[in-house]
């Protein structure tokens, strides 16, 4: 073995990094570039965080610019006996997902623009298919009932009777709003005497202006007029926003069902009364006990009475819940195949073929108010992760489209008639994100969302839509 082979191998000399006598005196080592692996790690981390920060920054800038465009509308003066223009908003959840996914778009990008514009809005949201369609159709059917009742000389509705308010102290004014005029000392007596109908009537007649505000000591205006009722052109009144392709489909179906369908469902439906299984079991228990001794029969009768009372209470709760659900959701009165064979409700049309305004409020019907459809992109599944990441970093472009459309809805700058050829496919790109298994099950169950959207030209010729603003230069308005 040679002497050279026994010598240790010398390590490569490290290059001295940048240093400074002052830093060296403080004990700070020389500054050197990190290794290759650390460079890769910090580069990827910086690009990832920087992309997120830039996208969030642009979203805030777009939303701020949109709100600045509509703020002058809210600064206009308005008399105390008028209410601002009202936008009706329909929100549906994405397929196989929660409603919160759609509400995020509403809270972050739509609601702020309407708020800073000083507009009123009515929010209609659904947690199951058919609620929006039922809501739209019921509005039209209720109006048809009122018009037919008024033409027949029958009273349409009982006016809300306000509670007489005695003059005097503030306690008398507040007590006049209470549903009961007596003070109940016993809690058990209070539970027994509570009437849900009185509570509902109290809620309908309750007015905060009787308790707080300037009208607490000053006379209230006799008539409240909406700005929508003062507009001569129905196109410039109100407005409808549908968040999601599903909400848009149900809105169109509800318009057709309300105008073409009957006021009441003609076909007979099965009884919706709950089964009396609990009572049958109680009767069986009673029959078995009757065969035993007399002493056991007395105890069994008490138990049976308690069980029957419990069953009756459960049945009342089930009936109340079923009635509330039935009011929110009804099966379609007509199908899309019946549209050509049906006639538009004549009580809602004028001699020249146009639709009348609501006789109670003088506000145009929903069919005459322009429509805006906002898609809700929502990808679900493990295989869609790359596309979801790409959309996450490009969300500012979606925010720009939404904000520009809502600003156009507020300012009413671009409105055109409804065109079946292209407007029937509004937000149709959203269907590409729907899970394939969900679509397959929907077709098997004859879901409303998976069916082809059908429109009647007699209906759509009275409809208008907010046209999507064209892409503009970055320095110009949205």
From Swiss-Prot:
Keyword annotations from UniProtKB, A to Z: Membrane, Mitochondrion, Mitochondrion inner membrane, Protein transport, Translocation, Transmembrane, Transmembrane helix, Transport
Region feature (Disordered): 152-171
Transmembrane segments: 33-49
Subunit structure: Component of the TIM22 complex, whose core is composed of TIM18, TIM22 and TIM54, associated with the peripheral proteins MRS5/TIM12 and the 70 kDa heterohexamer composed of TIM9 and TIM10 (or TIM8 and TIM13).
The protein's name: Mitochondrial import inner membrane translocase subunit TIM54
Mitochondrial matrix side: 1-32
Family membership: Belongs to the TIM54 family.
One of the Pfam families matching this protein, by short name: Tim54
Coiled coil start-end: none
Subcellular location: Mitochondrion inner membrane
InterPro entries: Lipid_Phosphate_FormReg (IPR050187), Mt_import_IM_translocase_Tim54 (IPR021056)
Side of membrane Mitochondrial intermembrane, spans: 50-478
Membrane-topology annotation of the record: Single-pass membrane protein
Function recorded in the entry: Essential component of the TIM22 complex, a complex that mediates the import and insertion of multi-pass transmembrane proteins into the mitochondrial inner membrane. The TIM22 complex forms a twin-pore translocase that uses the membrane potential as external driving force. Its precise function within the TIM22 complex is unclear.
Origin: domain of life: Eukaryota
């Amino acid at each position: 073995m040679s002497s050279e082979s026994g010598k240790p191998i010398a390590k490569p000399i490290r290059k001295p990094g940048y240093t400074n006598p002052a830093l060296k005196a403080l004990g700070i080592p020389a500054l050197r570039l990190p290794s290759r692996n650390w460079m890769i790690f910090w580069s990827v981390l910086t690009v990832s965080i920087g992309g997120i920060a830039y996208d969030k920054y642009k979203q805030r800038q777009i939303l701020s610019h949109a709100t600045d465009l509509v703020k002058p509308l809210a600064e206009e003066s308005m008399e105390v006996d008028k209410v601002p223009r009202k936008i009706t908003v329909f929100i549906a959840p994405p397929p196989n997902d929660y409603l919160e996914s759609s509400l995020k778009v509403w809270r972050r990008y739509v609601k702020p623009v309407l708020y800073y514009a000083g507009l009123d809005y009515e929010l209609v949201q659904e947690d199951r298919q058919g609620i929006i369609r039922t809501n739209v159709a019921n509005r039209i059917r209720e109006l048809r009932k009122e018009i037919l009742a008024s033409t027949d000389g029958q009273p349409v509705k009982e006016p809300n009777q306000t509670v007489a308010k005695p003059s005097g102290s503030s306690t008398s004014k507040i007590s006049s709003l209470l549903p009961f005029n007596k003070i109940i000392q016993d809690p058990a007596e209070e539970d027994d005497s509570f009437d849900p109908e009185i509570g509902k009537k109290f809620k309908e007649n309750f007015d905060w202006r009787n308790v707080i505000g300037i009208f607490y000591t000053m006379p209230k205006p006799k008539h409240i007029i909406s700005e929508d009722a003062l507009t001569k052109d129905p196109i410039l009144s109100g407005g409808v926003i549908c968040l999601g392709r599903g909400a848009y489909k149900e809105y169109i179906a509800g318009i057709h069902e309300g105008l073409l369908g009957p006021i009441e469902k003609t076909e007979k439906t099965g009884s919706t009364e709950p089964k009396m299984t609990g009572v049958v079991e109680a009767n069986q228990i009673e029959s078995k006990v009757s065969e035993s001794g007399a002493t056991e029969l007395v105890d069994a009768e008490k138990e049976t009475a308690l069980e029957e009372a419990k069953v009756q209470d459960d049945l009342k709760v089930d009936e109340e819940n079923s009635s509330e659900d039935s009011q929110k959701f009804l099966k379609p009165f007509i199908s899309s195949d019946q549209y050509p064979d049906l006639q538009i409700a004549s009580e809602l049309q004028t001699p020249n073929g146009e639709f009348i305004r609501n006789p109670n409020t003088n506000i145009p019907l929903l069919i005459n108010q322009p429509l805006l459809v906002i898609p809700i992109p929502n990808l679900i599944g493990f295989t869609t992760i790359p596309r979801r990441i790409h959309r996450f970093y490009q969300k500012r472009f979606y925010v720009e489209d939404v904000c520009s459309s809502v600003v156009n809805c507020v300012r009413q700058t671009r409105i055109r008639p409804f065109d079946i050829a292209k407007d029937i496919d509004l937000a149709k790109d959203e269907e590409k994100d729907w899970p394939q298994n969900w679509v397959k099950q929907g077709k098997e169950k004859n879901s409303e969302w998976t069916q082809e959207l059908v429109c009647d030209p007699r209906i759509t010729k009275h409809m208008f839509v907010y046209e999507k603003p064209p892409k503009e230069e970055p320095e110009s308005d949205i």
